[in-house]
Amino acid sequence: MKKKKINSNNLLLLITIVLFFVMYAAGCIVYADKGFTRFQTFLNILINNAGLICITAGMTCVMLTGGIDISVGSLVAMDCMILAVGIEQWGWSSPVLMLLILAIGIVFGIVQGFCISYLEIQPFIVTMAGMFFARGMTAVICKEQVSIVSDKIFTTLSSFKISLPFGGYLNKKGIMQFPYLRVTVVVALIVILAIYLMLKYTRFGRSIYAVGGNQQSATL
């Protein structure tokens, strides 16, 4: 019988998953008396990293083309600062600011994509310039001040809990508590599903794989 060889990409994924569960198991052993073994602890990892999940899902598409984008973190910081300052200092409405930062992100990506695809500048150089620009604009907008968002829409969304009908436990007061998710996790899961379907079932998704494999062949 022929032995099946493990693909290097699958091996890296397997190692990552194993390390994750090893660290989680270590946390369960060390902090067992502090409720670390509860299912909610695992869900908190998703809750705390929902934004990062959305970003990495988009970055996956970039990496599949063989490119790189190091401006993402600075762009997110700039958009968040515009949102916070716009609500607390400029007095703009939340829906308008949400549309504004989405538009800024789209325009930012189009400009960088144009420089990379048509001007044929290396992605690392273009996105590094974008990173410094976004980081500088963030400092200019915030003026070295911290803005705490107190808008009702955001406070409601951030405090809203989606209770799960399993994994409950009794707290110190003897009240049954069930694990929960936040809205951000649902959004992250929708983003992952949308990108998966796009990559697997659309012409654009197949083009991304083709460009990453061989750009000249994909052009033909």
Locations of the language-model features?
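Alpha-helical transmembrane segments within multi-pass membrane transporters and channels
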Residues: 91-132
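Membrane-interfacial amphipathic/re-entrant helices at transmembrane-helix boundaries
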Residues: 1-56, 90-96, 173-176
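Hydrophobic alpha-helical transmembrane segments
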Residues: 10-18, 45, 53, 74-78, ...
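Single transmembrane alpha-helix segments in multi-pass membrane proteins
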Residues: 24-29, 38-90, 114-121, 217
